[in-house]
UniProtKB/Swiss-Prot annotation:
Keywords: Ribonucleoprotein, Ribosomal protein. InterPro entries: Ribosomal_bL35, Ribosomal_bL35-like, Ribosomal_bL35_CS, Ribosomal_bL35_sf. One of its GO terms (biological process) is translation. Belongs to the bacterial ribosomal protein bL35 family. The gene is rpmI. GO terms for cellular component: cytosolic large ribosomal subunit. SUPFAM superfamilies: L35p-like. This is Large ribosomal subunit protein bL35.
Length: 65
């Protein structure tokens, strides 16, 4: 049986944690930052976790993670 291919875009976006979850970066912190408040930008800075509803999709994209 052939190997399952990893979705390369997902491999670059998600990192697996020791507990089995996946870390991800928050959106809306790339450009057009002048109109966003400092508080909003600060809260977007730390890594987020993939929600339970999306976890199955991420696991399917990363079969060897």
């Amino acid at each position: 049986m052939p190997k399952i291919k990893t979705v390369r875009g997902a491999a670059k976006r998600f990192k697996k944690t020791a507990g089995g979850g996946f870390k991800r970066k928050h959106a809306n912190l790339r450009h057009i930052l002048t109109k966003k408040s400092t508080k909003r930008k600060r809260h977007l800075r730390p890594k987020g976790m993939v929600s339970k509803g999306d976890l199955g999709l991420v696991i399917a994209c990363l079969p060897y993670a």
